[in-house]
Amino acid sequence: MWVSTHVLAGLAIAAAIGGPWWLVLPIVVLAHVVMDLIPHWDYTVSKHPVVYGCCDFAASLAAWLLAWFALGMPFWMAFMGPISGAPDWDVLIAELRKRPDVHWFPSHWKSFPHGRSGRAWGIGVQAVIMAASVVVVLAARPY
């Protein structure tokens, strides 16, 4: 899935659970693995994966900063968003190195049953997850 999808889901999980951080942290990392099982479309199969990847990382950074500064989420809670998306750094790094099959995170290995789908369905699934995550983040206020 896109990094921004993982980041928003991580923010939502942290907002919904509310702490402590040491409980939320493994849950958001596990959520990354579970979400990678859901059939989705990745820009790594497109003609311009690095461009899409950089835009995705920028959107993820914006979501994190909005949650932290604009919504007033405590730092530890807001940081769970980037933690949830962090495993996807290996995808961008692999693309930048022109070695798209070399990954360190287990749900990105070829042996992992990574969910894949067509573009329309795969983007739609991620849009629904993002929208639901935003609803949870906003509904959980104040933190």
Language model segments and positions:
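N-terminal membrane-targeting hydrophobic helices
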Residues: M1-Y143
